[in-house]
């Protein structure tokens, strides 16, 4: 059965979408079958996968609200070599429409129930807010991966996020776990980065990935070219870091790399 991982943080600009597409591409490069679900109305994961969000025939809105069959919604041609459920502005409307339907919190879970066995990993790019789309992601997921910058107030924000995840788990998914905490945009020359990193390891132990994602120009440039970093510059520090993260995740799952 494929593992479903929600990638979430209530704070924007922490590398959530970057992590989603680059981790997915790295997993796909290890011959795993991967699906990315873009639940962020901005559609950044869609565009960074080389898919024009203005040209797609169907989006996550159709999957969640219209209950369009999965095979009519999924995009199989992406630059990251993973499958994709795209997002566009209409995903914002899904928030309103879902309020009107029965079992609105588990629409995504139900939609994935018949296809999750077709994938090794399903990564969900969540919106940077707590709404019905995020709740659907949490209800469907086995675990939550939290990307976070090593910056001032990071620990305070993380405490609030952990509390939110705990409350959601109690209501919609009692089996939901923390997959791991990922340090992003890390600069080893910055004393604050090192101090926050040390505090994270002190408080959360082995939940903090050993892999660290550095600040990297090529990693930041890649989405504007519609590619994950490994297909934009495979020798960049960012591309190598996400390949290392994929390997670390597989080892945690005791899956041969």
Per-region residue spans from a language model:
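P-loop NTP-binding core
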Residues: 1-257
């Amino acid at each position: 059965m494929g593992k479903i991982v929600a990638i979430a943080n209530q704070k924007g600009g922490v590398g959530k979408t970057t992590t989603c597409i680059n981790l997915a591409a790295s997993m796909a490069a290890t011959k795993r079958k991967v699906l990315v679900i873009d639940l962020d109305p901005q559609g950044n994961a869609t565009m960074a996968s080389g898919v024009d969000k203005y040209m797609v025939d169907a989006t996550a809105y159709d999957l969640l609200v219209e209950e369009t069959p999965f095979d009519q919604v999924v995009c199989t041609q992406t630059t990251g070599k993973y499958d994709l459920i795209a997002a566009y502005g209409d995903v914002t409307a899904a928030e309103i429409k879902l309020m009107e339907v029965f079992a609105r919190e588990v629409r995504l879970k139900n939609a994935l129930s018949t296809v999750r066995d077709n994938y090794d990993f399903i990564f969900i790019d969540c919106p940077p807010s707590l709404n019905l789309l995020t709740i659907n992601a949490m209800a469907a997921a086995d675990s939550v991966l939290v990307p976070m910058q090593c910056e001032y107030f990071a620990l305070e924000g993380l405490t609030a996020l952990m509390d939110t995840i705990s409350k959601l788990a109690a209501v919609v998914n009692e089996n939901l776990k923390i997959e791991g905490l990922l340090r992003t945009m890390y600069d080893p020359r910055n004393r604050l980065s090192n101090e926050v990193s040390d505090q994270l390891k002190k408080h959360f132990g082995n939940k903090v990935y050993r892999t660290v994602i550095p600040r990297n120009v090529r990693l930041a440039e890649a989405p504007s070219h519609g590619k994950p970093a490994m297909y934009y510059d495979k020798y960049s520090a960012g591309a190598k870091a996400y390949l290392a993260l994929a390997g670390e995740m597989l080892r945690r799952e005791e899956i041969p790399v």
